[in-house]
């Protein structure tokens, strides 16, 4: 039986999560992409704590002059915001968790924007 797109994403996510683990020295940058928004969190898996979070639901992103929050431009802003918040807390290196999504489009744009803003992964 052929997998649906959702089942394939869930299977990829389980496979990625088996390998990707965030520590306090190098936390995990988890990305979740929905149809209209994109979310990014920096998580310390050893303490089960979210250290920083950013999304297109934040007022600074929503009030910007974007036509939509589901574009690559919006995910680039979220990438810059999450990198800025991480650097303020002294986090320079992270492990990237693409959340089962393919490294393309909005996920890739967020990752590249975070790299340009100073995060290393």
Swiss-Prot record:
GO terms for cellular component: cyanelle; cytosolic large ribosomal subunit. The keyword rRNA-binding applies. This is Large ribosomal subunit protein uL18c. SUPFAM superfamilies: Translational machinery components (SSF53137). Binds 5S rRNA, forms part of the central protuberance of the 50S subunit. One of its GO terms (biological process) is translation. It comes from Cyanophora paradoxa. One of its GO terms (molecular function) is structural constituent of ribosome. Belongs to the universal ribosomal protein uL18 family. Keywords: Cyanelle, Plastid, Ribonucleoprotein, Ribosomal protein, RNA-binding, rRNA-binding. NCBIfam families: L18_bact. The gene is rpl18. HAMAP family: Ribosomal_uL18_B (MF_01337_B). PANTHER family: 39S RIBOSOMAL PROTEIN L18, MITOCHONDRIAL (PTHR12899), LARGE RIBOSOMAL SUBUNIT PROTEIN UL18M (PTHR12899:SF3). Its main location: plastid. Pfam families: Ribosomal_L18p. Part of the 50S ribosomal subunit; contacts the 5S rRNA. The keyword Plastid applies.
